[in-house]
């Protein structure tokens, strides 16, 4: 479903940061200021947001993987919820340096987590002493928190979706190094450099974050549904061709 400018206004997408913290590279997307707060031009944001969603739909239709990244307190739950709804990986606790650029090391940790989860399923905890079980549970909880959202990622994602590029500078830098496209919400206090699909907007409001993340998740589901429909139509077309030539 298409997002309207009214929805963006209601979610507070247009509220930037205090004028003294601004980044001049965001000047083209700023409408003005009110009470020393920059106001983002939603007439710029809306089409750029729609361009980002169009790219997301195409990527999802081609079975691409989009990694959701949002580790700030006000975005953690929404990022996990919407990524799971879209069947995509996510990072919502802390970005571990090398998550993309040193994926081999991450794979070792993912294997450890999966082995530990399998051990729990098999009832191995009951065979341990109380102390061993406690240490085991602590380790598995730590791994689930830090890499649970990426345990089924399988490889480098085809794109990353980031809320707050300043807070997730390392994630953006790693994606840039590997040539992984970056879709990101950029507030008035950060630079849009290194971002392929810029969404100028408030990156602090939980309502605004929910609007962005829901839109991206919806676009992924739409892209996949469209791809399935195209396959069904193609199969039907082939069947009709066979019947006509029978």
From Swiss-Prot:
Keyword Secreted on entry: no
InterPro entries cross-referenced by the UniProt entry: Ribosomal_uS2, Ribosomal_uS2_bac/mit/plastid, Ribosomal_uS2_CS, Ribosomal_uS2_flav_dom_sf
UniProt cross-references to PROSITE patterns, sorted A to Z: RIBOSOMAL_S2_1
One annotated Gene Ontology cellular component of this protein: cytosolic small ribosomal subunit
Any one GO molecular function term: structural constituent of ribosome
Claim: Ribosomal protein is one of the keywords in the record: yes
Pfam families: Ribosomal_S2 (PF00318)
Domain of life: Bacteria
Keywords of the record: Ribonucleoprotein, Ribosomal protein
Swiss-Prot/TrEMBL GO biological process terms: translation
CDD domains: RPS2
Family, per entry: Belongs to the universal ribosomal protein uS2 family.
PANTHER family associated with the record: 30S RIBOSOMAL PROTEIN S2 PROKARYOTIC AND ORGANELLAR (PTHR12534), SMALL RIBOSOMAL SUBUNIT PROTEIN US2M (PTHR12534:SF0)
UniProt name for this protein: Small ribosomal subunit protein uS2
